[in-house]
């Protein structure tokens, strides 16, 4: 029983930590590519900015879904039999 709770805490930490790292890297790469393309074609900056913010929201949504799953594992643990 204690091993299951320990592994669930470890898994929740990994889900949140690695998800945050992945989201930060993804948004950083996307932002750099946006700046490159805006410098290359300034007339498309408004259209590209709209798409960039939409994709940033989707990247953050994937991270927040992972946080929700980790919180479900931590507080409403489905792996512990009652």
UniProtKB/Swiss-Prot annotation:
It comes from the Bacteria. Signal peptide: none annotated. Pfam families: ATP-synt_C. The chain crosses the membrane at residues 7-27, 53-73. It is found in: Cell inner membrane. GO terms for molecular function: lipid binding; proton-transporting ATP synthase activity, rotational mechanism. The keyword Transmembrane helix applies. The record marks 60 as: Reversibly protonated during proton transport. GO terms for cellular component: plasma membrane; proton-transporting ATP synthase complex; proton-transporting two-sector ATPase complex, proton-transporting domain. Keywords: ATP synthesis, Cell inner membrane, Cell membrane, CF(0), Hydrogen ion transport, Ion transport, Lipid-binding, Membrane, Transmembrane, Transmembrane helix, Transport. Disulfide bonds: none annotated. It is a multi-pass membrane protein. InterPro entries: ATP_synth_csu_bac/chlpt (IPR005953), ATP_synth_F0_csu (IPR000454), ATP_synth_F0_csu_DDCD_BS (IPR020537), ATP_synth_F0_csu_sf (IPR038662), ATPase_proteolipid_c-like_dom (IPR002379), F/V-ATP_Csub_sf (IPR035921). Belongs to the ATPase C chain family. F-type ATPases have 2 components, F(1) - the catalytic core - and F(0) - the membrane proton channel. F(1) has five subunits: alpha(3), beta(3), gamma(1), delta(1), epsilon(1). F(0) has four main subunits: a(1), b(1), b'(1) and c(10-14). The alpha and beta chains form an alternating ring which encloses part of the gamma chain. F(1) is attached to F(0) by a central stalk formed by the gamma and epsilon chains, while a peripheral stalk is formed by the delta, b and b' chains. F(1)F(0) ATP synthase produces ATP from ADP in the presence of a proton or sodium gradient. F-type ATPases consist of two structural domains, F(1) containing the extramembraneous catalytic core and F(0) containing the membrane proton channel, linked together by a central stalk and a peripheral stalk. During catalysis, ATP synthesis in the catalytic domain of F(1) is coupled via a rotary mechanism of the central stalk subunits to proton translocation. Key component of the F(0) channel; it plays a direct role in translocation across the membrane. A homomeric c-ring of between 10-14 subunits forms the central stalk rotor element with the F(1) delta and epsilon subunits. NCBIfam families: ATP_synt_c, PRK06876.1. HAMAP family: ATP_synth_c_bact. This is ATP synthase subunit c. It comes from Methylibium petroleiphilum (strain ATCC BAA-1232 / LMG 22953 / PM1).
């Amino acid at each position: 029983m204690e091993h299951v709770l320990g592994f669930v805490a470890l898994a929740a930490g990994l889900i949140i930590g690695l998800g945050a790292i992945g989201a930060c890297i993804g948004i950083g790469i996307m932002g750099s590519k946006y700046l490159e393309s805006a410098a290359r074609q300034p007339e498309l900056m408004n259209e590209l900015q709209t798409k960039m913010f939409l994709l940033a929201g989707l990247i953050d949504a994937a991270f927040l879904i992972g946080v929700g799953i980790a919180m479900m594992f931590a507080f409403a643990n489905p792996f512990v039999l009652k």
